[in-house]
Amino acid sequence: MKRYLITGGTGMVGSHLVNEIKQTDAHITILTRQDKTSNHPKITYINWSKEGWQHQVPDIDIVINLAGATLNKRWTSSHKQAMMLSRIQSTQTLFELFETREHKPEVLFNASAMGYYPPDLFTSYTELYRTLPFDFLSEIVYQWERFANKFKQFGTRVVLGRFGLILSDDGGALEMMELPYRLYVGGKLGSGRQWYSWIHIDDLIRGILFTINHDNAEGPFNLTAPIPERQNLFGYTLARAMHKPHETWAPKLILRAVLGQMSTVILDTQKVLPNKLHALGFEFKYNNLRNALDDLIKA
């Protein structure tokens, strides 16, 4: 039986992941910030905001660290601090948990983001690309991965999952992207040429578990579908799937003014390819954006 420790296990990605893992021979310990009672024999919740929580954690084989304040909220100075500290502090806390334990985890899967890569209209980024931080979001990613890599001191295999734009039917980015189309004001954002490197939630969960279970999976992995789309075509495809028009245009200056720094998520994007997943033989269920949207959207 595999023993999992998961942070962020009650969020969108975490909930899908827990639902998949509990169907296997496993026990799941989920760290939360509030008291929660489990009604499933394979799941235990621990409130890690309480003193002495560390003593409740059993020996662990696999750590999955998904904790972090949402990016889908206006980036005030206080929220930017929360975005950074929530990720770094949770990772450091996990490191300190195992630092004094004899039993070390075999694998750490640490969430990350494609914000590691600089915005570019022409470059196709693979995991071979290396860079230093160049803006606030890349600084978060850089520090998050740096703290996660400390687990290598334990002999733990560390996987850094650089998530793409996650498409799910229960919240997240797709819900926000659908709203303007439901209001008949969907269309091009900025130049419309910026890349959206997306991934269906089912493929994301499968990709996470694939890297955890594959002994040769280590280091950064781009968890994005093989065929990214430029925003204008992405929006057009979304509109067709929803049977709505794609006719308006929101200029970059307007988006910057309304959204502030958060606008970087939709304007300053990257074309990211999952080369390492392909090299290890992973097969995507949803390569094509229209197929992914047809599966998720309830018109």
UniProtKB/Swiss-Prot annotation:
Highest rank taxon of the organism: Bacteria
UniProt family annotation: Belongs to the NAD(P)-dependent epimerase/dehydratase family. SDR39U1 subfamily.
Name of the protein in its database record: Epimerase family protein SERP0438
Organism: Staphylococcus epidermidis (strain ATCC 35984 / DSM 28319 / BCRC 17069 / CCUG 31568 / BM 3577 / RP62A)
